[in-house]
Amino acid sequence: MTQSTVSSTIVEPYAEALMSVAQSNNLTNQIGEDVSFVLSLLQTSDDLKDFLVNPLTPADAQKAVLRQLAESRVQKQFFNFLLLLIDRRRIIFLEGICKYYQALLRKLNNTVLAEVTSTVELTDEQRHAITDKVKHMSQAAQVDLETSIDPDLIGGVIIKIGSQVLDASIRGQLRRMNSSITSLS
């Protein structure tokens, strides 16, 4: 089995189990917020991530750190889920489980994820315009925007919705013009 296959065979059932617990307690969105909180902790602190995924770190130490960081900030069910991941030595898959839970939650709420890459930070007006355009294209009730900056685009934006990519960047236009000119030769 490849690393990806192993990862998905672990990540998906755990995320689905978390969703099941969340649904049975009417906490899907609240646990979604908890998941986002934990993901932001992992993405902003490499030290925390390394500490949690290190197999040599004692489980009691991992639990103590999570108690300090998250116990009072997240739903009891989600905190117990985190402890379960430590007990089962699955905490190394936490980031993947959280991302898959977010995908399940988006599906449940008829929300799409639009990954937007631009040369500069988007204004609120631009975010609103992109959100409206994506809603219209996808027929989704809501849109989650994930933005990133890439100065190599020169200008414009690239919007990725699932497997569909809309390249409205200057770099993309130059690449298409180059292909057209090359094909004429």
UniProtKB/Swiss-Prot annotation:
<protein>
    <recommendedName>
        <fullName>ATP synthase subunit delta</fullName>
    </recommendedName>
</protein>
<comment type="similarity">
    <text>Belongs to the ATPase delta chain family.</text>
</comment>
<keyword id="KW-0406">Ion transport</keyword>
<dbReference type="InterPro" id="IPR000711">
    <property type="entry name" value="ATPase_OSCP/dsu"/>
</dbReference>
<keyword id="KW-0066">ATP synthesis</keyword>
<keyword id="KW-0139">CF(1)</keyword>
<keyword id="KW-0793">Thylakoid</keyword>
<keyword id="KW-0472">Membrane</keyword>
<keyword id="KW-0813">Transport</keyword>
<dbReference type="GO" id="GO:0045259">
    <property type="term" value="C:proton-transporting ATP synthase complex"/>
</dbReference>
<dbReference type="InterPro" id="IPR020781">
    <property type="entry name" value="ATPase_OSCP/d_CS"/>
</dbReference>
<dbReference type="InterPro" id="IPR026015">
    <property type="entry name" value="ATP_synth_OSCP/delta_N_sf"/>
</dbReference>
<keyword id="KW-0375">Hydrogen ion transport</keyword>
<dbReference type="GO" id="GO:0031676">
    <property type="term" value="C:plasma membrane-derived thylakoid membrane"/>
</dbReference>
<comment type="function">
    <text>This protein is part of the stalk that links CF(0) to CF(1). It either transmits conformational changes from CF(0) to CF(1) or is implicated in proton conduction.</text>
</comment>
<comment type="subunit">
    <text>F-type ATPases have 2 components, F(1) - the catalytic core - and F(0) - the membrane proton channel. F(1) has five subunits: alpha(3), beta(3), gamma(1), delta(1), epsilon(1). CF(0) has four main subunits: a(1), b(1), b'(1) and c(10-14). The alpha and beta chains form an alternating ring which encloses part of the gamma chain. F(1) is attached to F(0) by a central stalk formed by the gamma and epsilon chains, while a peripheral stalk is formed by the delta, b and b' chains.</text>
</comment>
<comment type="function">
    <text>F(1)F(0) ATP synthase produces ATP from ADP in the presence of a proton or sodium gradient. F-type ATPases consist of two structural domains, F(1) containing the extramembraneous catalytic core and F(0) containing the membrane proton channel, linked together by a central stalk and a peripheral stalk. During catalysis, ATP synthesis in the catalytic domain of F(1) is coupled via a rotary mechanism of the central stalk subunits to proton translocation.</text>
</comment>
<dbReference type="Pfam" id="PF00213">
    <property type="entry name" value="OSCP"/>
</dbReference>
<dbReference type="GO" id="GO:0046933">
    <property type="term" value="F:proton-transporting ATP synthase activity, rotational mechanism"/>
</dbReference>
